């Protein structure tokens, strides 16, 4: 055995020994880099969770991210070329298995009515879906307007008639309700006493003290919900609040980015050595929209319009069996276990729409629409803790600092694409350019796309087959709604996809 071989073996042996020591130190609750004990109430009181497993949020599926080709898979000659193919990487994340249902939204509006019905009815009204979206001049749809959202027969159908802004409000509400329930189940806080609201007529008190908000709980030292059976304590035995390091609270629910949504819809998996054998057209394999298997041969794999005047097939042999929307668990799920990623309803995504999105993008977690928010500090208390301003919904109020709104960063318009140097050598010239842009809505040359124009994807019950391809994209202003647009929530994954456990 020569000297080089001995040296290599010695190096490997030393590495294994050190790794073993580090592992043993960690297992024993001792820092491998300082030697100090973890979870020592008589020492530094540094708390560490050993062998921690992240829980999958309720109603969601853990999706392993990766590299894939985003963009058009088919061609519509008369359509705008706004989704050119390019390769990006998406981080692992969670997504709802089903579209948000009517029953889910009614749970939300019921909570709003229970909490704010007496003191702030306008907030309750703001959360209601727009039923008028069912009205069409040459169709009799009044029964849908009257019953679609409220009747129990439609409980399992997707919510429609909600704007992008309402969907974002729902995500924020869901974050707080899920985290509130997690703290209650862990015995950290008591369940809220909704019966006491009948005696409360002070709106500010309800928003500030009764409504649980995750950021308010973490940031506002004066906000202290009633203690539960098993509150957390510090080394001195004083009750303390839970923070993110305790592993009880979930991250924020939100709308999926366009890249996440498309990645989840195609559900492409490599079979061996990272090789993908099939470039899908739809969330299922093959280029056909009918089921090829003998058991359900010829049945449609999604809810869409088969042809002019044909929404569901002929009586006695109905195919997709849905004149309008269908139950959210209808049809076969894709390889990630997600239902209706094509058809049924289009779905809002987080992105601001730009037809040139493919020209300027990040190679990982591609997204346009960043607006960086800062909590609003109202004052400081007697010992210097920040006191944050609380908004009408009981949440920590936020603001956008100068230069923190980057929705139109390098978006291909005349200002950002052709006049970057003008801003450096002639700021006044750039200002004149902005001021002289066409803003007359009757002018055919006026831009119809703004920073409040959002992307929706997926195809719906009233769309032709072309729109079922997850790469297709359309847009609508964020304060508008339609009877064929719904949504589902997503959440960024904390930790590795291998460390996930289903929430019990």
Predicted segment positions?
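Bacterial N-terminal signal peptides that target proteins for export
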Residues: 1-10
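C-terminal motif of bacterial Sec signal peptides marking the signal peptidase cleavage site
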Residues: 18-20
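Functional-site microenvironments in short loops/helix caps that host divalent-cation chemistry
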Residues: 25-40, 62-63, 69, 74, ...
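Short, P/G- and charge-enriched loop/turn segments at secondary-structure junctions
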Residues: 48-50, 80-83, 443, 473-478
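A short glycine-rich, aromatic-capped structural motif
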Residues: 52-140, 155-178, 343, 486, ...
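Short, surface-exposed beta-strand/loop micro-motifs that present aromatic residues
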Residues: 59, 84-86, 335-337, 477-478
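Catalytic loop of the DD-peptidase/beta-lactamase superfamily, centered on the K-T-G motif
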Residues: 472-475, 485, 491-492, 496
């Amino acid at each position: 055995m020569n000297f080089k071989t001995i040296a290599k073996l010695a190096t490997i042996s030393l590495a294994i020994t050190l790794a073993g020591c580090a592992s043993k130190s960690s297992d024993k609750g001792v820092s491998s880099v300082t030697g100090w004990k973890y979870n020592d109430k008589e020492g530094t009181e540094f708390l560490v969770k050993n062998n921690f497993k992240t829980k999958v949020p309720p109603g969601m599926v853990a999706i392993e991210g990766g590299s894939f080709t985003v963009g058009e898979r088919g061609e519509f000659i008369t359509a705008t070329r706004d989704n050119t193919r390019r390769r990006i990487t998406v981080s692992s994340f969670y997504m709802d298995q089903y579209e948000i249902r009517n029953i889910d939204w009614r749970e939300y509006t019921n909570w709003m009515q229970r909490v704010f019905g007496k003191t702030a009815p306008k907030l309750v009204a703001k959360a209601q879906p727009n039923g008028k979206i069912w009205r069409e001049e040459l169709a009799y749809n009044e029964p849908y307007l009257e019953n679609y959202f409220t009747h129990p027969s439609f409980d399992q159908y997707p919510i429609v008639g909600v704007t992008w802004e309402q969907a974002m409000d729902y995500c924020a509400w869901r974050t707080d309700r899920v985290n509130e329930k997690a703290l209650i189940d862990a015995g950290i806080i008591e369940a809220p006493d909704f019966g006491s609201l009948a005696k409360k007529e002070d709106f500010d008190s309800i928003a500030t003290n009764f409504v649980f908000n995750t950021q308010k709980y973490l940031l506002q030292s004066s906000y202290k919900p009633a203690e539960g059976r098993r509150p957390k304590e510090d080394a001195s035995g004083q009750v303390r609040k839970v923070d993110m390091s305790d592993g009880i609270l979930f991250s924020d629910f939100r709308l999926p980015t366009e890249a996440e949504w498309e990645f989840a819809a195609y559900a492409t998996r490599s079979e061996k050595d990272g090789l993908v054998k099939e470039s899908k057209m739809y969330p299922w394999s093959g280029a056909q929209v009918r089921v090829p298997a003998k058991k359900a041969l010829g049945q449609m794999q999604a809810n869409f319009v088969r042809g002019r005047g044909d929404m569901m097939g002929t009586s006695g042999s109905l195919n997709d069996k849905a004149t309008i929307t269908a139950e959210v668990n209808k049809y076969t799920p894709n390889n990630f276990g997600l239902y209706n990623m094509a058809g049924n309803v289009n779905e809002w995504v987080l992105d601001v729409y730009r037809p040139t999105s493919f020209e300027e993008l990040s190679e990982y977690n591609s997204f346009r629409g960043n607006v960086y928010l800062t909590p609003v500090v109202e004052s400081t208390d007697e010992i210097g803790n920040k006191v944050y301003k609380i908004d009408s919904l009981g949440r920590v109020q936020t603001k956008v600092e100068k230069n923190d709104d980057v929705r139109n960063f390098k978006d291909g318009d005349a200002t950002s694409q052709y006049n970057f140097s003008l801003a450096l050598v002639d700021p006044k010239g750039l200002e004149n350019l902005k001021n002289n842009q066409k803003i007359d809505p009757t002018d055919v040359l006026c831009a119809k796309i703004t920073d409040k124009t959002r992307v929706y994807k997926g195809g719906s019950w009233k769309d032709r087959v072309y729109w079922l391809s997850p790469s297709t994209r359309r847009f609508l202003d964020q304060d508008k709604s339609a009877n064929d647009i719904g949504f589902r929530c997503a959440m960024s994954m904390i930790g590795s996809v291998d460390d996930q456990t289903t929430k019990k």
